[in-house]
Structure formats: C-alpha cells, structure tokens
A protein has these predicted regions:
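An N-terminal-biased, well-structured beta-alpha scaffold segment characteristic
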Residues: 1-93, 196, 216-218
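Short beta->alpha connector loops at strand-helix junctions that form conserved
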Residues: 30-31, 73-74, 90-101, 192, ...
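Short, Asp-centered acidic motifs that coordinate Mg2+ and/or phosphate
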Residues: 46-47, 69, 200, 228, ...
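Rossmann-like adenosine-cofactor binding region
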Residues: 53-60, 174-270
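Phosphate-coordination loops involved in phosphoryl transfer and adenosine-cofactor binding
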Residues: 67, 142-145, 217, 226
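Rossmann-like dinucleotide-binding domain for NAD(H)/NADP(H)
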Residues: 88, 92, 226-319
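Phosphate-binding beta-alpha-beta segment of Rossmann-like dinucleotide-binding domains, i.e.
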Residues: 88, 96-145, 157-160
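Glycine-rich Rossmann-fold phosphate-binding loop(s) that bind the pyrophosphate
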Residues: 151-152
Length: 319
C-alpha cells in the first residue's frame, strides 16, 4: 500500500507519521502544486492525502487504476473533480467536523469588530485621538437581524452563538431553500427575503456551481443600507469586485473575509485599501487544537481505507 502526501504546508508531519506508523504504514511527502507535479510525484499511489493539489480529470485518469482514495486536509473539495473521481472509482473524503468552533468564533469575531468599529477606533487612538465620536454611528447588535447563509455544522453553530445577543437570527440554506429551520428560535427564509432582511450576512455554505457568485452586485443592491458581509467559507461565493464597490459606495458598512477567490489576495485588490474591509489569511479554521485534530483525522481516514475498512467521511460514491 503506497500512501503519499501530495502537498501540505503544515510545519510538522509528526501526527500523521505516528498514526500511519502505528498502523504499519510509511508514506512519501511531496510539495505538488501543479497537475504535472501530481502526475509525476504521485504515480503508483493508492492513497493520497492532499491540501491544495488540483486533482482534475486529467490528473485522476493518469493516477488510476492504482489510486483508490484521496483525503483532503479540510472541508472543501472544490480542488477535486468529483465527477471524474466518481467515474474512475476514486473515493474522496474530507474532514467536515474539525475546527467548527474556530470558524464560527472567527466569523463572530469579524462581525463584532466591524459592528463595534474596533479596528477603526483603535487606529484613531493610536494616532493620538481620544474621542468615541470618531466611531459614530454604531448600532446595537440586539436590534440587528443576523443572517446565516448555509446551515451546515458551522452555520448552525454560528447561529446558536449569534442568538446569545438576543436579536433576530434568520437562516437560508441554498441546498434546502424550502426546508424548516434547523436552529430552534431562528427563522428560515427564502434567499431573496433573506438578503433583504439581514443586517449581517455570514456565509457558511460550500463553493459549488450553485453557490459560485451567489452574492454579487444584484444581491448587494437588495441588501439593507449599512449591512455587513462576513465570509469564512469560500471566496468565490462572494463577488469580490461587487463587494469592493458596495463598500466604496457606502452601501455596505463593512465586510470581514477570511477567504478570497484566488489566494493570496492579489496586491492590487481594492479590498486591501478599504478601511471597512477586514481581511484575514484563511486562518478561521486554525487553533493548535483544530490543526492537530485535522492532521489526525486525515491520517486515520487513510489508515481505515488502507486496512480495508469503511471510511468515516465519504464525499462521493465511486462507481
């Protein structure tokens, strides 16, 4: 059984190495970034553990029939051609239940920092000012409607935390638009009503054909004046040009983003120059505990497959 880590930028592989070694397996570790890298370095692999590798139809076809499993370090699997993997008999797995508290906390932190204007007033104080009026206007969070777009594990957790402020929380699930509320005390709305009602839209849905560009210029135009957008999910869900325009025009009061369409955020992005936009470098998932959990679960999934057991986190059903 050949197990390969195609790419991983973590500082240490100690946890994976121990999990694999305890089960009697070794592994190869590469730094593949391109399709050609994957084809050359992962040839003959039965199991691949990957972080960012672009597993296109071409790559998967070249690695089959040896390849049986790809496990991704993370939740999203948009770097993998799922249709091709399913057709070619490759099992795809992710780790959907790690870092849930971290991501929901990060989204909540971005929201609080923006609504309370903490970065702005901190910069003012550092510049020698001492005047709360520099932050005017600031709204009371309890009187705001907090919207949660995507009601999976992280979205539900964010909604529960947001409800602690005592205000209205509304939900919208792009995959279950007519479903009942999955969070007691929160109201489920159709997308158009949701966009028009929310003072804060916190994005927690996966990136897919259905959600790519889900929030663009038309949607921002229908939002409440002075609304906020928080995105700790995937960059492509929110149109960055439309977001920048909404912030620059004052239609939006602020945005907090942890993911962008192309990472890292390009140096000439207008979002970098906007004081009302808080940008973090795709770190919402991170804490020491969540990083260790992720590494352990990826390696454990690889071991399960290698030993002929059922996987715990299947994303597809291979042919």
């Amino acid at each position: 059984m050949k197990i390969v880590v195609s790419d991983c930028d973590h500082a240490s592989m100690r946890i994976e190495e121990k999990v694999l070694a305890d089960a009697g397996f070794g592994y190869e570790h590469h730094a593949c970034r391109t399709e050609d890298d994957l084809i050359a370095k992962c040839a003959g692999a039965n199991v691949i553990m990957t972080q960012y590798g672009p597993f296109s139809d071409r790559v998967l076809a070249a690695l089959c029939p040896d390849l049986g499993l790809i496990v991704r370090y993370g939740v999203g699997v948009d770097t993998i051609d799922l249709d091709a993997a399913t057709r070619l008999g490759v099992q795809i797995c992710n780790v959907p239940d790690y870092g849930m508290n971290e991501v929901s906390d990060h989204a909540l932190g971005l929201m609080l920092a923006l609504v309370r204007k903490i970065p702005m007033i901190t910069n003012s104080t550092r510049a020698g000012e001492w005047d709360y009026r520099m932050s005017i206007p600031v709204r009371r969070i309890k009187d705001m409607t907090i919207g949660v777009l995507g009601v999976g594990r992280i979205g539900r957790l964010f909604a529960l935390k947001a409800m602690a402020f005592g205000g209205r929380v509304v939900l919208c699930d792009p995959y279950k638009p007519d479903g009942k509320s999955r969070v007691p005390g929160a109201e489920q709305l159709p997308f158009d009503d949701f966009i028009a009602a929310a003072d804060v839209v916190s994005v927690h849905c996966p990136l897919s054909e259905e959600t790519n560009g889900l929030i663009g210029a038309p949607e921002i135009a229908r939002m409440r004046p002075g609304a906020f957008i928080i995105n700790t999910a995937r960059g492509g869900i929110v149109d960055e040009d439309a977001l920048a325009e909404g912030l620059a025009s004052g239609k939006l009061a602020g945005a907090g983003i942890d993911t962008v369409e192309v990472e890292p955020l390009r140096k000439d992005s207008p979002l970098r120059a906007l004081d009302t936009c808080l940008v973090t470098p795709h770190m919402a998932w991170y804490s020491e505990e969540s990083a260790n959990e992720l590494k352990r679960k990826v390696a454990e999934e690889a071991v399960r497959f290698a030993q002929g057991h059922c996987v715990t986190y299947p994303v597809n059903r291979p042919a």
